[in-house]
């Protein structure tokens, strides 16, 4: 038995554990901790900061900030996006604002120089278009998938950041209407998004989806085995 077959056999023997997110409970001075999951093929683990809930028509129901314990999320990835470092390279379903928000260019703080701003706008456009195209192709391959079609219908409205600002999830500068880079007010009044993101900025918020499809499947798209 070579080592590659041994890895395959071990994976198959533990298939019942694939995709399960379990936690080891707190005990004494030890805090609750995540047990590293056995990932499905072409999947990765990411910390999602915001959950957006839609109905099956792709209409926004609500959005919420994920507390630290509920952030770990198993997401599908492509061969390219699983190891992305720079440039536009979208995940297929759950991703950062740069990819899922069609109104990203309206709200991302602009680069100072004209040349950098031009490059920034090009990257933002390519990021969203790549995400939309991948999701569209997936939905075309699986036309009966209510969740995919709902997410696709919503992101095509290109109002995601606008909706999150209006819902009090994200915050914009009063003077520029671009995303507030840091919270400068009283720390006791710090909005949840800044507390969750820590040293990171709002542009780096990672989005996951719930769809109330009313078909008996879990609304959490990231917990649906069919996805």
Per-region residue spans from a language model:
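Conserved phosphate-interacting/catalytic interface
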Residues: 1-227
